[in-house]
Swiss-Prot record:
Subcellular location: Cytoplasm
Subunit and partners: Homotetramer. Forms heterodimers with either ThiH or ThiS.
The name this protein goes by in its record: Thiazole synthase
Annotated catalysed reactions: [ThiS sulfur-carrier protein]-C-terminal-Gly-aminoethanethioate + 2-iminoacetate + 1-deoxy-D-xylulose 5-phosphate = [ThiS sulfur-carrier protein]-C-terminal Gly-Gly + 2-[(2R,5Z)-2-carboxy-4-methylthiazol-5(2H)-ylidene]ethyl phosphate + 2 H2O + H(+)
Pfam family membership, one: ThiG
Disulphide linkage map: none
Record-annotated active site: 96
Biological classification of the source: Bacteria, Bacillati, Bacillota, Clostridia, Eubacteriales
Length: 255
């Protein structure tokens, strides 16, 4: 499968996974292995930046790319502060911006996220903004220096699938400068496959794997789904027909 060039790196896997909601941290390395994910996102509020003891980072392989996120930030100022703390603590220059002041639906504030993106991109961060799928805002993220655009498929943690499918299709069609990563709401491997068939460059998910009865097996299922969806997109779909059309012609068969 073709590689994903993003944030100054070349990746084999187009499946990004999160680290929350697992029954224990011990299962995380096994999920990373089964999913073959290379990009692992971690909420900075779950990371003890002053200690390596019983730290979530201890369970993430050294060859994985760490994508810290600013979960808990309510505005641009708080997101920027968390990003700078992350970089100072040695967590790298990749940052996923989450700026959410809505505590009920946890929908991202595009305005505050764009402000944070512009500030951090100028400071040398590769910024991955979590956003509501709006075309004009997506263009503003690109202009602000985002390394990718990350539209939500459904409210975070709901496992409801691609409820914003038509909006995401518009972003895929119109935003060519940076990768499109579908983030949040993906509940089943078929959702991930569909996102990749649509032309998304990658998907990021957490709850669907972490809350599965068998997270290790589910990680593998998502790996296969993402690969299948990407290959189907690259292969190009056959044309749809209004009427039935036999695969083998019947003319002359019964002479």
């Amino acid at each position: 499968m073709d590689k994903l060039n993003i944030g100054g790196k070349q990746l084999e896997s187009r499946l990004f996974i999160g680290t929350g909601k697992y029954g224990s941290n011990e299962i995380l390395p096994k999920v990373i292995e089964s999913s073959k994910s290379q990009v692992i996102t971690v909420a900075l509020r779950r990371v003890d930046l002053n200690s390596r003891e019983e730290n979530i980072l201890n369970y993430i392989k050294d060859d994985c790319v760490l994508l810290p996120n600013t979960s808990g930030a309510r505005n641009a100022e708080e997101a920027v502060r968390l990003a700078r703390l992350s970089k100072a603590a040695g967590c790298g220059n990749w940052i996923k911006i989450e700026a959410i002041s809505d505590n009920k639906y946890l929908l991202p504030d595009n305005y505050e996220t764009i402000k944070a993106t512009e500030i951090l991109a100028k400071e040398g961060f590769y910024v991955f903004p979590y956003m509501n799928p709006d075309l004009m805002d997506a263009k503003r993220f690109v202009a602000a220096g985002a390394a990718a655009v990350m539209p939500l498929g459904a409210p975070i943690g709901t496992n409801k699938g691609l409820k914003t499918e038509e909006m995401i299709k518009i972003l895929i069609e119109e935003i060519k400068e940076v990768p499109i990563i579908v983030d949040a709401g993906i509940g089943k491997p078929s959702d991930a496959c569909k996102a990749m068939e649509m032309g998304a460059d990658a998907v990021l998910l957490n709850t669907a794997i972490a809350t599965a009865e068998n997270p290790i097996l589910m990680g593998e299922a998502f790996k296969n789904a993402v690969e299948a969806g990407r290959k189907a997109y690259l292969a190009g779909f056959g044309t749809e027909a209004k009427f039935a059309n036999a695969s083998s012609p019947l003319i002359g068969f019964l002479r």
